[in-house]
């Protein structure tokens, strides 16, 4: 434990802000249980701090990536050599960092004394993809619209370096890398800008408007990739695929690309749908999706068959999906009828498989929704993939915020509308086998999440000073902790989750919100 003692001493010598910023833990880090078992003298905050960067670096995609070794080595120059020689992993890929850029930037915002700018610049020089993704996130961090009421005063010095870092990255590109960067960004800026161009158009003209704009965009080489899936090379835009999605203030659009795998057969072309939206601060979605990713890893670690899909956010990518609202535009029935149309008669293998997929995904998002409290859960924000699984998107209202000036009209902890209960509970009175399976999975998922309460809270707490709307009112961290009910026994917590499921069952406020969205926005209910 000598190396652990040394690191904890290092952490203890840093300002309090260091520990306040860092308390979030690696959900997959194999050392975490060992550290807790063998180091009773160290607080949870110390252990969280020890594993903070490990969390970012632990999403191993390709441990043979030589560039990764340089990235880690460069980062290790910012901490005492006696520590990094013994503790840190040395073979982690750049891609393993990129899934957590937003929190990574939050982490480094309090470490200016550790040559943050130099580290980011050196890392960007090792990989074009790393540089591109970093630039996208730096742009998201420095948008003037999101600076309100001095929200960034505490991070003013960090904000000051953002534009400089971006420019220095671009200045450091070779001519070939600069050409690649310019083509990639120009292409997707044109695609994304369509969302803004549609805003003044009447709804009935938006489909034609998307096609008209897409026809103007020309491919600029065969090396362009989807920003959230760098292994997917874009071959062509399906100009007829554009669909305007439902949103009160924006016009998100879904566009399908024909793509090939970077390392696969380039003749094997497949469709990949992406959602683009102009004018939104996506960092709140990133925060919600990090918690969802953490929950997914927790469920997997304890052997729970619960489904969550923490999609990527730059533009948002959710493959092979349609929103519930879109499904309603092509059929008069509810989910029960739609599932029969798509998967066969009730009782058939295909239907029951789809129902099971819907069940495990609904249970996963029930637990996530209880903790994150996402609102604005109209049918435009619920996607279904081609095997029946539910995916929640658009986390513009989480924790303490809700639409309509924080009316909190949607007061169920998660959405469980009448048509959803028809699939989950054929009996209609909470007596069916599938209903009991659903509730059982919700309980097991909630109990599993409670065991990692500090880690989940730390993930959210790290962004507390970010200026995000979800932290703008009330006591978001305190109320998040209350929803875990740490004072309860496991039995009491299980009963609490059962009551949450019962309360959400076809709740009138859920139906009422869907009706309001249908009347105001035309969102199919």
Curated annotation (Swiss-Prot):
InterPro entries assigned to the protein according to its UniProt record, in alphabetical order: Kinase-like_dom_sf (IPR011009), PI3/4_kinase_cat_dom (IPR000403), PI3/4_kinase_cat_sf (IPR036940), PI3/4_kinase_CS (IPR018936), PI_Kinase (IPR015433)
A biological process from GO: phosphatidylinositol phosphate biosynthetic process
Region listing for Pleckstrin homology (PH) domain conferring phosphoinositide binding specificity, in residue ranges: 163-278
Cystine pairs: none
Sequence segments annotated as region (G-loop): 245-251
Domain PI3K/PI4K catalytic: 239-509
Keywords: Kinase, Membrane, Transferase
Record carries keyword Repeat: no
Gene3D superfamilies named in the record: Phosphatidylinositol 3-/4-kinase, catalytic domain (1.10.1070.11), Phosphatidylinositol 3-kinase Catalytic Subunit, Chain A, domain 4 (3.30.1010.10)
Enzyme Commission designation: 2.7.1.67
GO molecular function: 1-phosphatidylinositol 4-kinase activity
Stretch list, region Catalytic loop: 373-381
Coiled coil stretches, renumbered: none
Subcellular localization, as worded in the UniProt entry: Membrane
Bilayer topology: Peripheral membrane protein
Purpose: Acts on phosphatidylinositol (PtdIns) in the first committed step in the production of the second messenger inositol-1,4,5,-trisphosphate.
Protein's name according to its UniProt entry: Phosphatidylinositol 4-kinase alpha 2
Organism listed in the record: Arabidopsis thaliana (Mouse-ear cress)
């Amino acid at each position: 434990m000598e190396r652990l003692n040394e690191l904890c001493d290092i952490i203890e010598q840093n300002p309090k802000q260091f520990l306040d910023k860092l308390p979030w833990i690696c959900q997959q880090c194999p050392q975490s249980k060992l550290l807790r078992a063998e180091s009773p003298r160290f607080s949870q905050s110390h252990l969280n701090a020890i594993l903070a960067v490990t969390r970012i670096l632990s999403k191993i995609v390709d441990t043979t990536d030589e560039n990764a070794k340089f990235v880690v080595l460069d980062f290790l120059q910012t901490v005492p050599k006696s520590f990094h020689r013994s503790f840190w992993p040395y073979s982690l890929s750049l891609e393993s960092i990129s899934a957590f850029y937003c929190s990574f930037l939050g982490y480094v915002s309090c470490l200016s004394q550790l040559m943050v700018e130099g580290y980011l610049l050196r890392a960007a020089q090792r990989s074009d993809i790393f540089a591109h993704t970093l630039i996208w996130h730096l742009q998201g961090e420095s948008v003037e619209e999101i600076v309100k009421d001095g929200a960034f005063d505490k991070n003013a010095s960090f904000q000051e370096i953002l534009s400089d870092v971006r420019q220095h990255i671009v200045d450091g590109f070779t001519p070939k890398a600069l050409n690649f960067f310019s083509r990639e960004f120009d292409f997707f800026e044109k695609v994304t800008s369509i969302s803004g161009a549609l805003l003044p158009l009447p709804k009935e003209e938006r489909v034609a408007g998307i096609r008209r704009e897409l026809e103007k965009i020309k491919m600029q080489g065969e090396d362009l990739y989807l920003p959230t899936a760098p292994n997917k090379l874009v071959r062509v835009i399906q100009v007829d695929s554009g669909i305007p999605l439902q949103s009160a203030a924006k016009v998100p659009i879904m566009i399908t690309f024909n793509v090939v795998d970077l390392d696969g057969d380039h003749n094997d072309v497949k469709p990949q749908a992406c959602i683009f939206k102009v004018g939104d601060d996506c960092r709140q979605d990133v925060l919600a999706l990090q918690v969802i990713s953490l929950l997914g890893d927790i469920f997997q670690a304890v052997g729970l068959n619960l489904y969550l899909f923490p999609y990527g956010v730059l533009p948002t990518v959710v493959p092979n999906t349609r929103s519930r609202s879109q499904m309603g535009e092509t059929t008069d029935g509810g989910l029960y009828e739609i599932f029969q149309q798509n998967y066969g008669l009730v009782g058939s293998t295909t239907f029951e498989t789809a129902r099971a997929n819907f069940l495990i995904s609904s249970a996963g998002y029930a637990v996530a929704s209880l903790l994150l409290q996402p609102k604005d859960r109209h049918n435009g924000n619920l996607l279904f993939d081609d095997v029946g699984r539910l995916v929640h998107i658009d986390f513009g209202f989480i924790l303490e915020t809700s639409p309509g000036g924080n009316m909190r009209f949607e007061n169920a902890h998660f959405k469980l509308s009448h048509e959803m209960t028809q699939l989950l509970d054929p009996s209609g009175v909470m007596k069916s086998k599938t209903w009991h399976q659903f509730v059982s999975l919700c309980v097991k998922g909630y109990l599993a999440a409670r065991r990692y309460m500090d880690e989940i809270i730390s993930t959210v707490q790290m962004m507390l000073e970010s200026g995000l709307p979800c932290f703008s009112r009330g006591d978001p961290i305190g109320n998040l902790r209350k929803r875990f009910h740490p004072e309860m026994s496991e039995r009491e917590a299980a009963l609490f989750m059962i009551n949450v499921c019962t309360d959400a069952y076809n709740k009138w406020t859920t139906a009422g919100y869907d009706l309001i969205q249908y009347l105001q926005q035309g969102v199919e209910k």
